[in-house]
């Protein structure tokens, strides 16, 4: 899954290689910081053509891999 691999890469940038589940919070626990979230948003815009200006966006939805997948699924339903 591209999403999981990208998140693993973001965590690795901070020497965080601890395992995590798809539903585990990553932002609320501090594993991903605001800069990582910006990189994630840019990745989703370029890789999946998600237009965050066109969807009801709550940054908390990017807190887990499953939340990110839900955002992509919602976008695909609207696009």
Label the model's feature ranges.
Residues 54-57, 62-78:
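C-terminal structural segments of small proteins and small subunits
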Residues 1-19, 70-79:
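Thiotemplate assembly-line natural product biosynthesis machinery
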Residues 50-52:
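Short C-terminal boundary/hinge segments that cap the last helix of small helical domains
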């Amino acid at each position: 899954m591209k999403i999981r691999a990208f998140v693993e890469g973001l965590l690795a940038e901070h020497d965080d290689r601890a395992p995590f589940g798809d539903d585990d919070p990553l932002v609320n626990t501090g594993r991903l910081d605001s800069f990582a979230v910006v990189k994630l948003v840019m990745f989703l815009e370029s890789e999946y053509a998600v237009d965050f200006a066109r969807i009801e966006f709550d940054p908390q939805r990017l807190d887990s891999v499953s939340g990110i997948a839900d955002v992509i699924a919602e976008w695909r339903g609207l696009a």
